[in-house]
Amino acid sequence: MKKIFKYAMVGLLGCVTLSSCLESALETSPTDSMSGTGLLANANAALVPLNGIYRSMYASWSPSANTHQSFGISSYTLMADLMGEDMIQAAQGSGWFWFDCLYNVKSRYTSTAWRSYDVWNCYYTWISNANYILAAESTMEGEKADVNYVIGQAYAIRAYSYFMLAQTFARTYKGHESEPCCPIYTEPTVAGTQGNPRSTVQEVYDQLNSDIDKAIELLNGTERKH
């Protein structure tokens, strides 16, 4: 009887072990990467995509042949100076940067090799990434201060991006409130998402002011990590 019981227990343990192995083998979640849902499940994991946004701010957005003119966020702020009144191009010269910064060469609007495409692609990529983080606000787990930090940073990034797009692709705010500005996206998008029409200058500034107010509220009292 003891031998029978012993063999029965060994067999039972073998079945349990085999069952566990089979469940492990059938696990579909990768062990060397995380899904977008997994990255946004808690505040600590969400620092990864947030860090990615900040890392991309000093990376080139252009093909290798044009990294001299689009080498990250600094190149866009330098370009903004050139398009303003602090620095004046008095003559076209050889043509370098003349039409590029005026944005009036239509053949270059859709080219990935020129600045207008870079600026548009850059800021809307940050907006898209921020929208994914913000969409997880109600489900993100973690200490309240940590969640507030991640969400607050995402609001700040989106506000800044819309501000720069408005500065670049629209006229000044005062006196032009009802004129076209840039499209507004506040929800995650994917390839094939129907594009939104251009919002007015007033609508874009209302959106970015709302975002920055939320960022200030959430980031108040949190430990700075960036």
Task: Tell where the protein language model's regions lie, with residue ranges.
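Sec-dependent bacterial lipoprotein signal peptides
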Residues: 1-19
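Membrane-proximal, proline-rich intrinsically disordered regions
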Residues: 21-77
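A structural signal for short, hydrophobic/glycine-enriched beta-strand patches
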Residues: 31, 43-44, 68-111, 120, ...
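Inward-facing hydrophobic residues that define packing positions of alpha-helical scaffold repeats
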Residues: 50, 127-130, 205, 212
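Surface-exposed patches in mature extracellular/periplasmic domains of secreted proteins
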Residues: 60-69, 146-147, 222-226
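Conserved, well-structured interaction surfaces
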Residues: 94-169, 199, 214-225
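Short coil/linker segments at helix-helix boundaries
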Residues: 168-207
